[in-house]
Amino acid sequence: MLNPSIDSLLQKIDSKYTLVTVAAKRAREMQLANNCVVEQPVSHKCVGKALEEIDAEVLSYVPSEDKVAE
C-alpha cells in the first residue's frame, strides 16, 4: 500500500499529473542536494520522500499565470 495514500495527496494537489510532475522534480532536486525536509521519512527513495513532503504540506504547487488564464 502506498504511504502516503493517493487520496490524501490529491487533496493537496488537485491533478494526479501535476502531482507526478511536482514529485519528480523535487526528487531530482533531492538526488542532487540530498536534502529532505521531512524529519523521519518512511521511504528511503527520493520520490517517496517527495510525496511525503507534499503530504506534510511542506512542498506545495502554485499554478503559473499562463495556466490560470486558460
From Swiss-Prot:
It catalyses: RNA(n) + a ribonucleoside 5'-triphosphate = RNA(n+1) + diphosphate. Pfam families: RNA_pol_Rpb6. Its EC number is 2.7.7.6. GO terms for cellular component: DNA-directed RNA polymerase complex. InterPro entries: DNA-dir_RNA_pol_omega (IPR003716), Pol_omega/Rpo6/RPB6 (IPR006110), RPB6/omega-like_sf (IPR036161). HAMAP family: RNApol_bact_RpoZ (MF_00366). Belongs to the RNA polymerase subunit omega family. This is DNA-directed RNA polymerase subunit omega. It comes from Bacillus cereus (strain G9842).
